[in-house]
Amino acid sequence: MSTEETGAYLREMHQKRGYTLEMHGIMAAADLAWAKKYGDFIEATYTGQRLLDRKTKELLQIVVEAALRADVDQIRAHVRVALQEGATPQEILEALEAVIMPMGALAFRRGLQAWAAETSFNPIDMSGEGPTSPPPLGEE
């Protein structure tokens, strides 16, 4: 397979999914025929329209990846696509909140970090040095 064909496939993948990861480039460069079969599987189970719409599938991706403690940047990619597909920042946050018990606080934290970074949420500065820092204990 040519480099040109691999590049075209990766551009098409990015257009359909809304993102590409480093692993996609490696897979396509190493074995484009297999990567295309994998892409067909992803289309059938994830990006293709069936009963669940893409927004719902992205919410599921976000909470599952948070539960599995995926890399924050990977979770952010799905937060970004969910927003593009019409999810509100509050819906994404609620999806993460709804599964905190079964997935645990550590996984929730990773999902929350991805959500805050992608939605430009400005958290309270907990260092005690910034303008949004909480007041010292006893001075509320």
Model-flagged regions — what are they?
Residues 1-56, 108-140:
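Acidic, glycine/proline-rich low-complexity segments that act as flexible tails and inter-domain linkers
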Residues 33-40, 69-75, 103:
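Short acidic alpha-helix initiation/capping motifs at coil-to-helix transition points
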Residues 57-65, 96:
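Short, structured motif recognition centered on aromatic/hydrophobic residues
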Residues 66-68, 136:
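A generic structural signal for short
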Residues 68-93:
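Mid-chain, well-packed structural core segment of small domains
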Residues 80, 97, 113-116:
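A broadly conserved amphipathic alpha-helix scaffold signal in soluble, globular proteins
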Residues 95-99, 130-133:
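Short linear loop/turn motifs
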Residues 98, 103-106:
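Substrate/cofactor-recognition hotspot
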